[in-house]
């Protein structure tokens, strides 16, 4: 991996971050969750709580200035 490139994962959150130019460190700072915690979610190794989803969605809205929905970032089960 070359400098300036980050590893990408096949999750909605990670694809959205890449498409919108949101860096993991910025999302961590804005959401209040650690980069390590967000990495586990981005990589699909951990399911976020409802509270965590709400915080990440709010952070993505602030960072992108777009009306982001939870369903754009996460696979929401029934």
Which ranges hold each PLM region?
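A short, Lys/Arg-rich alpha-helix, primarily the initiator
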Residues: 1-26, 30
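Residues in the helix-turn-helix
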Residues: 26, 37, 72
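A short, basic/aromatic helix-end/turn motif that makes direct DNA contacts
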Residues: 31-33, 61-62
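Recognition helix of helix-turn-helix/homeodomain-like DNA-binding domains
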Residues: 33-48
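Key DNA-contacting residues within the recognition helix of helix-turn-helix
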Residues: 39-40, 54-57, 74
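DNA major-groove recognition helix of helix-turn-helix/homeodomain DNA-binding modules
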Residues: 51-70
């Amino acid at each position: 991996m070359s400098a300036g490139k980050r590893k990408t994962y096949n999750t909605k959150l990670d694809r959205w971050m890449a498409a919108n130019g949101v860096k993991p460190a910025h999302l961590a700072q804005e959401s209040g969750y650690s980069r390590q915690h967000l990495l586990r979610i981005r990589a699909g190794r951990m399911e976020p709580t409802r509270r965590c989803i709400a915080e990440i969605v709010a952070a993505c809205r602030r960072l992108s200035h777009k009306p982001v929905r939870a369903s754009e970032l996460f696979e929401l089960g029934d």
